[in-house]
Amino acid sequence: MLFLRFKFFNNRLLFVSVLCFVICVSCKREHKEIKIKGEKATELKLPERPNILWLVTEDMGAYIPPFGDSTVVTPHLSKLAKEGVIYPNLYSTSGVCAPSRAAIATGMYPSSIGANHMRTNSFTKERGLPAYEAVPPSNVRMLSEWLRKAGYYCTNNYKTDYQFKAPVTAWDESSPYAHWRNRNDDQPFFAVFNFTDTHESGLFEPYGLREIETRLYRAGDTTYQWKNYGASHANNRMSEAETPQYLSKDTKFNIPPYLPETDLVKRDMWKLYNNIGEMDNQVGAVLQQLEDDGLLENTIIFFYGDHGGPLPREKRLIYDSGLNTPMIIRFPNKLEAETSDPQLISFVDFAPTLLSIIGEKPKEYMQGQAFLGQYKNKERSYIHAAADRFDAETDVIRAVRDKRFKYIRNYRPEQGYYLPIDYRERIPTMQELLRLKAEGKLNEEQMQWFRDVKPEEELFDCKSDPFELKNLANNPEYQNKLVELRKELDRWLTAIGDDANLPESELINKLWNGSNTQPVTSDPKVSINNGNITISCDTEGASVGYKIVTAGNKTSKTWHIYNGPFKMPLGSTLEIIAHRIGFKPSKAIQISTSDL
């Protein structure tokens, strides 16, 4: 679907949306400036303490109509874009989910807190290492905990994957049933819904949507029994015949030049877009709930992906195909509707921005900057990214990008780009690439990923070379830009304390302060004075959560954050857990009023 906009002499805007209900025969993924009404105004007047809704999808490149790709119709996202602002220059800090989600949760770069390897709790045993968690500084809290402290009801539905176990204080609810509808009526909310439809595993064969992807967000429906809650992504698939089809299998796809145009690849492209169609359907279900509740114009709605696309040579890499993900924000009363904000935005900017939106000053430890709200910063000049271990395979790459150029530093130039990652090799396109490589049938652009070695430095003009295939690092005409971005990368590495060459074993030793075992949060201590309960914990930076079970056996529906002394009803029982991020949580302590 293409958006056409015209401005008339009476300054009224006519929005004409051309919906393609007939399957297009030559759909094309555009890599050009989006034709829209104009750029967003410098300042936005936002309501005080608005509700905030995040709609987060996985493995999402710019494969949707608001960003120039009309292959599959997405009526709900297209409407959201029509009523909101599109952000074409959002970049994840990594080309894979867990490190990127760590950045979102903390406002810190993954490589500054030990969250840069994919994942900290898997594929370590095979390398003779223990499973571990990222350990940020002691003053770091999850973004949602800061919002809870500010009075927000915070829900997550339901993926976490932060590279550390979330403290009980992080969310009011985190489950497939988590929903803003469970809050007190007078309470603002921050609600996160994670859509898994577009994950790379959705390209595996046999194809079919999984139960986790067909729920249409049954949040709040506690009578529904989940078959797949907590189980493998791949379980409980419907057959392909049962799976809804959002576009014809005969659709002609604009396949990126780094992939071959074979029937298997075309089928994966069809699955990719079909999954987007289902994701859009689920987004629409959540938005309908918001509208049904009369909350649409009191809520700032974010839609974005957790990194770039799912295909080989996209996910896990720090080319734009792996980092760039579309974002749409709809503001109450359609403020700045149908505009684009071209500023560079990094995932580390989300945490300070949300605090800024609700009038809270961003925390000093946060390495990002606010791009909206009371504490909005001037636009950033660069975004930064890193790639390290993925499952059982390791590389070390760092990158910096401005609005046009990207600089990549390869710390292992003797090693090729391609890594034989078992999970990725379940994708038919990956199997096809390997088959054609073995047969000598890949062209020069497709073979670049399979080079035996790679240059120490790469420089790409992302405007003229959006697929990053032409390295300009040795071109004399671009030496000034090369030096500029090289210096910026060095500055960034020093600023965040990223020792790119640090072996993972030494990283773990550093996170654990020289110990061979993961640190444990001290058990909380409780005292009472004049009827007031006081809780403390000897572990610096530990969050303390508590629940009260009354004499009538009624339990708090959520874990409260301990902020200071409080009174406890007679005959009740107190359950307490202390937890510093990256440490193991304390034991759960239970104390009744009769014990005090």
Curated annotation (Swiss-Prot):
Induction note: By rhamnose.
3-oxoalanine (Cys) modified-residue sites: 97
Stored InterPro entries: Alkaline_phosphatase_core_sf, Sulfatase, Sulfatase_N
Swiss-Prot/TrEMBL cofactor(s): Ca(2+)
Binding-site residues for Ca(2+), renumbered to this chain: 58-59, 97, 306-307
Cleavable signal peptide: 1-27
Enzyme nomenclature, EC number: 3.1.6.-
A cellular component annotation (GO) from this entry: periplasmic space
Record localization: Periplasm
GO molecular function, one term: metal ion binding
Sorted UniProt keywords: Calcium, Hydrolase, Metal-binding, Periplasm, Signal
Presence of the UniProt keyword Zinc in the record: no
Broad class of the protein's primary localization: periplasm
Post-translational modification: The conversion to 3-oxoalanine (also known as C-formylglycine, FGly), of a serine or cysteine residue in prokaryotes and of a cysteine residue in eukaryotes, is critical for catalytic activity.
A matching Pfam family: Sulfatase
Active-site residues per Swiss-Prot or TrEMBL entry: 97
Enzyme kind, highest EC tier: hydrolase
Co-factor note (free text): Binds 1 Ca(2+) ion per subunit.
Annotated family: Belongs to the sulfatase family.
General function of this protein: Sulfatase involved in ulvan degradation. Ulvan is the main polysaccharide component of the Ulvales (green seaweed) cell wall. It is composed of disaccharide building blocks comprising 3-sulfated rhamnose (Rha3S) linked to D-glucuronic acid (GlcA), L-iduronic acid (IduA), or D-xylose (Xyl). The sulfatase desulfates Xyl2S-Rha3S, product of the degradation of ulvan by endo-acting alpha-1,4-L-rhamnosidase, to Xyl-Rha3S.
Name of the protein in question: Ulvan-active sulfatase
Species lineage: Bacteria, Pseudomonadati, Bacteroidota, Flavobacteriia, Flavobacteriales
